[in-house]
Amino acid sequence: MLGRKKNPETVQTESKSVESKTHDPLRRLGVLDDEDVLLMLQGSKMMKVRSQRWRKDRRLKLLEDCVTVWCESSKTSRKSNRQQTFSVTEVECVREGCQSECLRRMTDLVPEKNCFTVVFRGGRKSLDLCCHTQEEAERWVRGIRTLKDRVSNMSQKEKLDHWIRGYLRRADQNQDGKMSYDEVKHLLQLINIDLNEQYARTLFKKCDRSCDGRLDHVEIEEFCREMMRRPELDAVFRHYSGNGCVLTTLELRDFLGDQGEDASLVHAKSLIQTFELNDWAQKNLFMTQNGFTMYMLSKENDVFNPDHTHVYQDMSKPLAHYYISSSHNTYLTKDQVTSASSTEPYIRALNQGCRCVELDCWDGDKGEPIIYHGHTLTSKVLFKEVIETIAQYAFKASPYPLILSLENHCSVEQQAIMAQQLQSILGKKLLAKPLSDLPLKQLPSPEELKGRILLKGKKLNGLLGKTESWTSFTNSSDEESVAGGNKKESKKDLARSASTKLSPELSDLVVYCQSVPFSGFETANQRPPSVITSFSENEALKLIKDSGKLFVRNNSRQLSRIYPSAQRLQSSNFDPQDMWNAGCQMVALNFQTPGEQMDLNQGRFLPNGRCGYVLKPEFLCDPKSDFDPENTGGGPGHIPTQLTIRVISAQQLPKINTDKPNSIVDPQVWVEIHGVSIDKARAKTQRIDNNGFNPRWDCTVSFQLQLPELALVRFMVEDHDHKSKNDFIGQFTLPFTSLRTGYRHVHLLKADGSTLSPATLFIHVKVVRRGVHIKTVSERIGKA
């Protein structure tokens, strides 16, 4: 006998158990009866496509957590295992048909209606797939979109619940629906916590009501509730609650007043109606501890001001009065020497709200202009394909004007082709003539240019005199040097660039962003507002140091674009804050390179609905401003402010070293101020050993700010390491002017800017301006 026949009742019970495991996440996501999601759970065979030569049959299947999609592969390495799955939370969008660069080149080899592309956030490559039927492709597209929308609309508490249940399934190694003590220890390792052995056993025994040495479904839930208790949050609740059990509307109103929010009874009642889960409490207008936790973890209580999540600033000012989200070498996927040129980075940048993208244009074969990093090993992409991509995605994330920064190295003939392609593809979106025939006194506003695409480039019959008008002059202050500063060819190439003629057709399309070299501020003041000058980072820093006031005044009426040094061959970035301090509008960064500089950029453009335009402080918009970014001991914008932040705790920080199951993070938190030089500062908490699940610091840091309007606040969490460099865990950056006071949660982001949900920091923020502080209710009745 090879094996014992299972009892039919046992088989039926196991079948129901498996079914219920799948139904739980379906029910929580509200997709229990969704036929598209049910198809995904069954799995489908389809073709994975990378090129015309690389096409492999794969089976894709949605796993039981209803968030993870598994792609069958014969590879067995740990890295490949990670790449075999993706979470719908990592998906930026799903594109139907042959919309990717790869699939567009294969329309004669694959049926377009059977294809779709999964585009991920961050640096992960897109996934091109071809199903056997059109219906199957449509159902997978709908299914992924449905799950993506449902997960993004979950409350923070629901996300935590879903997160912990996913780990429970992984920890239940024999999949019997119960957990032994060893499986519980495995769970603790998975969720990044190293509990004291005695405490873990005590907690296990406390929850083991059946006393059989294994936790069933109900007991596991109790164990998780105990694990996820937030004593620091409970303390805040008890402080405001008269009886320690519920908050009345009056008590909740007092709490809201201390938070610096709308402290009305109407607002307090609306929060109870929204976040209270208990029917009796909701009916009687009480908020229980669970309801309070739901509220505290919600976006309503986020550290970032929710009023700033939509366009709230005046968009009728001249373009020069705004910071403009700008990308450098937009076409590159990685470094400036060997990486691929592609349309994908344009899509990513535009979807992030970028409003100025760069096109490095060169003569291509067969009369077709191309885009690549000249005289390097980077691959090439057709100019036409890039413009088609821009036409499709230009205004998906923002309705405000998009600027195309042309680095023009093409012959007159191919420039004419560029002009024709720009007009035929972009159509009415392309601004080809001024909005008014009247002489230009100031640049038009983002509101006036809504939905329009502007060209930044050289112009004939411009400002350099008629005898010079047929030449596209190039110098280090106006155009980026070719090939990132290749010395062997730079003299020859620059000489050739200096005599490159400009096509009248292309010149005519340049309206409000005419590129001119910098010839001093006296000359700049005599030029119209429609000119723009590009500076390398080093040139800009020198101007800020030597002529800061003049630079600020110039930037109040004309646009300036700052680009990274040619020596940054790995596409690294400079600190954009110094340029923003001087009022520079277009501080172009390598969007393909994550890091602190891109964190700052994301934080700078987080407010105003992430539309890519943020109004500069008034003292940077005044043509007679006396503001000097290098000397900020007083003067315009000077508002002495004390910022005090208490870093209380963190929740659900992820494991960093996933290759080592026993590795648990030792987190510490940095709080950084990025602003004018006198305000720049950082402070850190102590580290907490072996606890990424619910570390607690209760550490207070304080900063003295002189120009709060220019300051960014960055929270960064890292894994402390004695032997090597600390590992980055997550961060969140926002303008000081968008920072909310009181008890707040900081929802952390990954290095690529995507969400690290459900990881959060719990903090308390206090702001005192000009030495005057109005005491909160808590401070009047006693310290919390």
Swiss-Prot record:
Instruction: List residues binding substrate.
Output: K456, K458, S534, R561
Name the positions where Ca(2+) 3 binds. N329, E358, D360, E407
A Pfam family the protein falls into: PI-PLC-Y
Recorded GO CC terms: cleavage furrow; cytoplasm; plasma membrane
InterPro entries from the UniProt entry? C2_dom, C2_domain_sf, EF-hand-dom_pair, EF_Hand_1_Ca_BS, EF_hand_dom, PH-like_dom_sf, PH_domain, PI-PLC_fam
Q: Does the keyword section mention Lipoprotein?
A: no
> Which keywords does UniProt give here?
Calcium, Cytoplasm, Hydrolase, Lipid degradation, Lipid metabolism, Membrane, Metal-binding, Phosphoprotein, Repeat, Transducer
Q: Where is the C2 domain?
A: 621-750
Q: Which domain of life is it from?
A: Eukaryota
User: Per its record, what are the GO molecular function terms?
Assistant: calcium ion binding; phosphatidylinositol-4,5-bisphosphate phospholipase C activity
Look up the EC number in the record and give it.
Answer: 3.1.4.11
Domain PI-PLC X-box positions:
313-458
- Bilayer topology term: Peripheral membrane protein
Instruction: Please note every region of biased composition (Basic and acidic residues).
Output: 16-25, 486-495
Q: How is the cofactor bound?
A: Binds 5 Ca(2+) ions per subunit. Two of the Ca(2+) ions are bound to the C2 domain.
Query: Where does it mainly reside?
Result: membrane
Active site (record annotation): H328, H373
Q: What does this protein do?
A: Hydrolyzes the phosphatidylinositol 4,5-bisphosphate (PIP2) to generate 2 second messenger molecules diacylglycerol (DAG) and inositol 1,4,5-trisphosphate (IP3). DAG mediates the activation of protein kinase C (PKC), while IP3 releases Ca(2+) from intracellular stores.
Q: Which protein, by its recorded name, is this?
A: 1-phosphatidylinositol 4,5-bisphosphate phosphodiesterase delta-3-A
Task: Tell me what organism the protein belongs to.
Answer: Danio rerio (Zebrafish)
